[in-house]
Amino acid sequence: DTIERARQLDAFYIRDKYGEYASKHPRFFTNMDGSFAVGDPVSLCAAGDCLDVDIMAGNTVDEFRSFIPAADDKELSAKAEGIFGEKAEKFLALPGARESDGHGRYASVSGIEVTAKAMFSRLKEHFPDKRYYYYRFNPDIPGEDNPGSFHSCELWFMFETLAKCSRPYVGRHYDLARQMCNYWCNFIKTGDPNGRDADGSQMPLWEEYTDGSHSGMTFVSEGSVPEGSDGELVAFLTEHVKNKI
C-alpha cells in the first residue's frame, strides 16, 4: 500500500501477478472506471449514447490485424460457418478470404479499420448531420529494424515532430507530416480537415465516410491519396461488425 513496499517486491512476483491480471483483463481495452469511462466506447457510439460531434478515426496498416486462425482450408471453412452462419460461403468466395500469410492467419484485415467504419455507419444513423473521416497510415518508416507502419507511428507526423524522433526521416516524410498536421489542425478548428497547404495550394480532398461513398484518406510516402471505396472483404466485415455492435 506504499511505494516503499512496492519497491521491495520481487521482480518475478510482479511478473507472475501481472500475468494473472492480463489473463483476465485484456490489454488495449477500455478501463471502465464508472466515472470518466462509463462503458465500451464502440457500444456507446453504436447506441448513440455519445457526444454529437464530428469524428476522425483511423489506423496504421500493420497494427492490430484481425484474422481467422486455421491450420488449413477445411478448418477455415468450419470457423467461417461458426462466425458468419449462412453467409459463410459468401465470405469464403471473397477475394482474400482464403489467403493465408503462411502462419495460419487467413483473411487478415485491420480490426481498427473495420470497427471504425462500422461505428461511423451506426453514428450516421443517430447523427446524420455530423461528418466522419477515416484515415489509413502506410508510408515507409525508416530504420534498421524495418518496423513497418507500427502502432502510433503516425503521431510524429500529425504533430509534425519528426525531428524529435531518432529515425532517419527525409524530405518526403516531412512533406507528408506538414500535410497531415494541416489536415488535423483544420479538423480541430472547423470539423473539416480540408484546406490549403503551406504554399497556398489546395490539398487533396478528404471526403467524409458514408455508407454510400466509403471514402477516406490514405497517407503514403508520396503524400495524401484519397480513397473512394472499400475492398469486398473489408466491406463485408464492416457490415458484419455493424450488425454486431
Regions flagged by a language model, labelled:
Residues K117, S121-I245:
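Mobile gating loops/cap/lid regions near enzyme active sites that modulate substrate access
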Residues L51, E86, V114, R178-Y183:
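A non-catalytic, amphipathic alpha-helix used as a structural packing/dimerization or gating element
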Residues G85-T115, S121-H126, Y133-P139:
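Alpha/beta-hydrolase fold catalytic core
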Residues L9-Y13, Y18-A22, I83, P95-R98, ...:
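Alpha-helix boundary/capping residues
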Residues D1, G96-E99, F157-K164:
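Short acidic (Asp/Glu) and glycine-rich catalytic loops that position anionic groups and cofactors
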Residues I3-R7, R15, S77-E81, A88-A93, ...:
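Generic detector of well-ordered alpha-helical segments enriched in charged/polar residues
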Residues D1-E75, K79, D101-L123:
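Substrate-access "cap/lid" subdomains that shape
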Residues C50-F91, S221-I245:
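C-terminal, loop-rich substrate-recognition/catalytic regions characterized by aromatic stacking residues
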